[in-house]
A protein has these predicted regions:
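Penicillin-recognizing serine hydrolase domain
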Residues: 23-178
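Substrate-binding clefts and substrate-entry loops adjacent to catalytic sites
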Residues: 7-20, 47
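Signal peptide-directed extracytoplasmic domains
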Residues: 1-7, 29
Length: 179
């Protein structure tokens, strides 16, 4: 399920997981909001698990960075979010199929590849535009870049943020994770 969710943004998987865990999408969104608050998020309200447009569903880049940090602290999430392709096994209702990672900075064969990226998630809605969350690590320093409402420069903007972050000295205040 996580491969479909993180590699292909399979909204039906997000809804299915929510219903499996909480019985209802709304109940799961409540759990998401509770966890977001625990992580220090102050500008986030979830109403669904897939991020599709809803006027009451919103977040900030800062909050998304807090959420991404918690996610990338999980080894399973890092493994799934860094997978280039995954074959979903056949079921009684569907043949086996392959899903491919949408985040271009992970793929060494792509011109947007960025050395050190250990995972990430793409997104797009008409309200949010292109969104990109990227986790990268170099020389023991882990950074998270969050881009929202981009028309087309989300990869270039992410590269610029990561380049800037990695260029900061170890003792500079911007080089450490701060809440």
């Amino acid at each position: 399920c996580l491969y479909g969710l993180l590699l292909k943004s399979a909204n039906e998987v997000a809804n299915g997981l929510a219903e499996h865990v909480s019985g209802r999408v709304e109940a799961f969104a409540s759990l998401m909001n509770q966890r977001a608050r625990e992580l220090g998020c102050t500008g986030t309200n979830f109403v669904n698990p897939n991020g599709l447009n809803n006027s009451n569903h919103y977040t900030t880049a800062r909050d998304m960075a807090f959420i991404a940090k918690a996610a990338f602290d999980n080894e399973i999430v890092r493994q799934v979010a860094s997978t280039l392709t995954y074959q979903i096994p056949a079921t009684k209702n569907a043949a086996a199929r392959t899903v491919t990672m949408g985040h271009k900075m992970i793929n060494p064969a792509d011109s947007r590849y960025y050395e050190g990226v250990i995972g990430g998630k793409t997104g797009y809605t008409s309200l949010a535009g292109n969104t990109l969350v990227t986790c990268a690590e170099k020389n023991g320093k882990r950074l998270i870049a969050v881009i929202m409402k981009s028309s087309s420069s989300h990869y270039a903007d992410t590269k610029a943020l990561l380049d800037y972050g990695f260029a900061l000295g170890q003792n500079e205040s911007g080089a450490r994770w701060q809440q």
